[in-house]
Swiss-Prot record:
<protein>
    <recommendedName>
        <fullName>Undecaprenyl-diphosphatase</fullName>
        <ecNumber>3.6.1.27</ecNumber>
    </recommendedName>
</protein>
<feature type="transmembrane region" description="Helical">
    <location>
        <begin position="63"/>
        <end position="83"/>
    </location>
</feature>
<dbReference type="GO" id="GO:0008360">
    <property type="term" value="P:regulation of cell shape"/>
</dbReference>
<keyword id="KW-0378">Hydrolase</keyword>
<feature type="transmembrane region" description="Helical">
    <location>
        <begin position="143"/>
        <end position="163"/>
    </location>
</feature>
<dbReference type="GO" id="GO:0050380">
    <property type="term" value="F:undecaprenyl-diphosphatase activity"/>
</dbReference>
<keyword id="KW-0573">Peptidoglycan synthesis</keyword>
<keyword id="KW-0997">Cell inner membrane</keyword>
<dbReference type="GO" id="GO:0005886">
    <property type="term" value="C:plasma membrane"/>
</dbReference>
<keyword id="KW-0046">Antibiotic resistance</keyword>
<feature type="transmembrane region" description="Helical">
    <location>
        <begin position="243"/>
        <end position="263"/>
    </location>
</feature>
<dbReference type="GO" id="GO:0071555">
    <property type="term" value="P:cell wall organization"/>
</dbReference>
<keyword id="KW-0133">Cell shape</keyword>
<dbReference type="GO" id="GO:0009252">
    <property type="term" value="P:peptidoglycan biosynthetic process"/>
</dbReference>
<dbReference type="Pfam" id="PF02673">
    <property type="entry name" value="BacA"/>
</dbReference>
<feature type="transmembrane region" description="Helical">
    <location>
        <begin position="178"/>
        <end position="198"/>
    </location>
</feature>
<feature type="transmembrane region" description="Helical">
    <location>
        <begin position="276"/>
        <end position="296"/>
    </location>
</feature>
Amino acid sequence: MGAIASMGPLFSLMILLAATSELLAACWRNLVLGVVQGLTEFLPISSTAHLKVVPMLVGWGDPGVSATAVIQLGSILAVIAYFKRDLAEVLKGIALAFKHGQWREPNARLGLAIAIGTMPILLAGMAIKLFWPGYEASSIRSLPSIAVVSIVMALLLALAESFGPRLKQMHLVKGRDGFVVGLAQALALIPGVSRSGSTLTASLFDGWQRQDAARFCFLLGIPAITLAGLVELKDAFAELSLGGVLPLLVGIVSAAFVSWLAIDWLLKYLQSHSTWIFVVYRLLFGVLVLAWWLSGRSN
C-alpha cells in the first residue's frame, strides 16, 4: 500500500504532463487554423473551404462551424482596426443624415449601402439556423461540393475580370450597390463560394474599380462576420472546458494578426494588378481537392 501511495505524485505528474501536452497541441492546432483563417478570409479564395480542407489534410478532421465562426472574430477585429477611420466617417455621415437629412452625403450613402447589403446574408443565415438543423453535416459542406463551387467561382471571377467596366468609385456608392453585392455575399453561406470572392466578383461585374470594390467588400463584411461569430460564440464556449478557452484565444489572435496583413496586401496589390492570380489558384484548388476526394484518400 505504501508503494502505491508513494506513486501518487508520479501519477499526478503524468496527468499534468498529459494535460499540458494536450493543451499545447490544441493551441498549435488553433494557431494554424487562425493563420489559415487570416490568409483566406479577405483573399477571394474561401476561408470556409480552407478551414475544412487543411485540417483534413493533416489528420485533424473538420473543426466544425462553431469553432471556425468564433476564430473569424479575429478577422473582424483586424478589419475594424484597419478601417477604423473609414468606419468613423461612415458613422459620422449616418449621424448627420439622421440629424439633418443629408442622405446624399457619400459616407451616409456608404453606411446605407452596408446596411442594405447585410440584410440578404442575415435573412439567409437565420433561415439556415432555424430550418436546416443538419446544415453542418450536409453534403453542401462535402469536399466534392467545395471543389466544384471553387471552380465555378473561379470562372465567374474570370468573367468579371474580363468584362467588368471598372468605372465606379467608393464615393459613388448607392443603396442599390449594397443590395446587389449583398445578394452575392449571401451566397457565401455555401462553403467554397468565399464571401470576399463572391462580393468582389459581383462588384467587378457591376462596374467597380478593383481597389474600391475590395474596400467596399471588406466594409460590407464587417456586420456579417461579426454576427456569424457572435451567433456561434455561445455554442462554441458551451462545448469548451476551461482548458479549451486558451486555444480558442490563440486562434482568434493569430487570425487577427494575419488578417490585417492580408487586407493591407490585397488593397495594395489591386492598385496595379488584376485578380487573375486568384482565378488560377481557385481553379487549381478545386481540381486538386476533387482529385483528392476521387482518390479515396480523404476518407
